[in-house]
Design a protein with these regions (language model features):
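A short, N-terminal "cap"/entry segment at the start of jelly-roll beta-barrel domains
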Residues: 1-23, 102-114
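Histidine-centered metal-chelating micro-motifs
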Residues: 35-37, 71, 75-80
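Glycine- and acidic-residue-biased ligand/ion/polar-headgroup-sensing regions
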Residues: 43-54, 59
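Conserved short histidine dyad/triad with adjacent acidic residue
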Residues: 9, 26-40
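Ligand-binding loop in jelly-roll beta-barrel domains
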Residues: 75-99
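Short acidic-glycine-tyrosine-enriched beta hairpin
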Residues: 60-75
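Short, surface-exposed secondary-structure edge patches
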Residues: 37, 46, 61-63
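A cytosolic small-molecule/anion-sensing beta-strand core signal
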Residues: 50-51, 66-67, 85
Length: 114
């Protein structure tokens, strides 16, 4: 099943890649210069940079990430994102993002295509 692209903040969209009983993966595409404000969630998260460059700000400290880099975020750790270049990310969450799966189900057409 092809899941829809869903904008999560200006210049940042995500699409469910795959999920199971205990894990969830999404692809996120971030336009150059886009920002995701500080937030936290009860899920553990691994951010893997497929392409591009971004800053991941964790507890006020910026971590420069580029193609091939990965970063682990524990549960409830505040973090924010600032992109330097257009960036494509594979995010893995545990437990699954039930909120994102519900949003996938309620997304209305048209569905953005690659």
């Amino acid at each position: 099943m092809q899941h829809p692209w869903i904008e999560i903040c200006p210049g940042i969209r995500r699409r469910t890649h795959t999920h199971g009983r205990t894990m969830y993966q999404q692809i996120a595409e971030l336009e150059a210069g886009s920002k995701m404000p500080a937030h936290s969630h009860p899920h553990e998260q691994i951010v893997h940079i497929l392409s591009g460059r971004m800053k991941l700000i964790v507890d006020g400290r910026a971590h420069d990430l580029k193609t091939g880099d990965s970063f682990y975020l524990g549960s409830n750790v505040p973090h924010a994102v600032e992109t330097i270049d257009a960036t494509r990310v594979l995010d893995t969450f545990s437990p699954p993002r039930e909120d994102y799966l519900a949003a996938d189900q309620s997304a209305s057409p048209p569905v953005l295509q690659d």
